[in-house]
Regions:
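Alpha-helical recognition segments enriched in aromatics with Gly/Pro capping
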Residues: 15-168
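Divalent metal-dependent hydrolysis catalytic cores, especially in the metallo-beta-lactamase
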Residues: 1-10
Length: 168
């Protein structure tokens, strides 16, 4: 087995995430409100293409943060202020941190380009994580495709419980 070519860390690429957010704002796909920046899902007509979810079927709060700062309940966070004990970085929107989905888009662009062949992950990442990656990456990079092929694996379970680091 060979060692990986790259082992990027999200915390070392926050500058690229800030650049991507700025590009999305400039192109009209994102907006700032009270030091938060959100991706406006309704602006991306193909949202839901991977998960086969219709925009009107999305329920506010389903693994997404419900906030009065959003224009629409389905909009997802690109940048938010950090809480007192959380890591934070300086940005045009104040001290804060990037949203969960942005790190993958920024690092894949740096190491794989605007479009690449294969993207994978667990089936639990199809929505919202991979769906949001597609939206923000395609809109920021002006591409018709983010990844050509998607591979999603099921889980290993023990006593009907998902086996994962997050489970302990």
């Amino acid at each position: 087995c060979e060692d990986p070519t790259e082992q990027p860390k999200a915390t070392e690429h926050v500058d690229l995430m800030i650049e991507m957010i700025s590009e999305l704002i400039k192109k009209g796909f994102a907006y700032e409100n009270h030091k938060h920046v959100y991706f406006e899902v309704k602006k991306f007509d193909e949202y839901g293409q991977l998960s086969n979810k219709k925009l009107e079927e999305l329920i506010a709060g389903s693994r997404i943060e419900v906030s009065d700062n959003k224009r629409n309940s389905e909009d997802f966070v690109l940048w938010k202020p950090s809480l007192e004990n959380e890591p934070s970085w300086d940005s045009p929107w104040g001290k804060g941190r990037p949203g969960w989905h942005l790190e993958c888009s920024a690092m894949s662009k740096k190491f794989l380009g605007n479009e690449f062949d294969i993207h994978g992950g667990g089936i639990d990442l199809i929505f919202p994580h991979h769906e949001n990656e597609i939206a923000q990456s395609r809109c920021a990079n002006d591409t018709k495709v983010f990844a050509n092929y998607w591979l999603h694996n099921a889980f290993i379970t023990i006593s009907n419980e998902k086996m994962a680091k997050s489970q302990g």
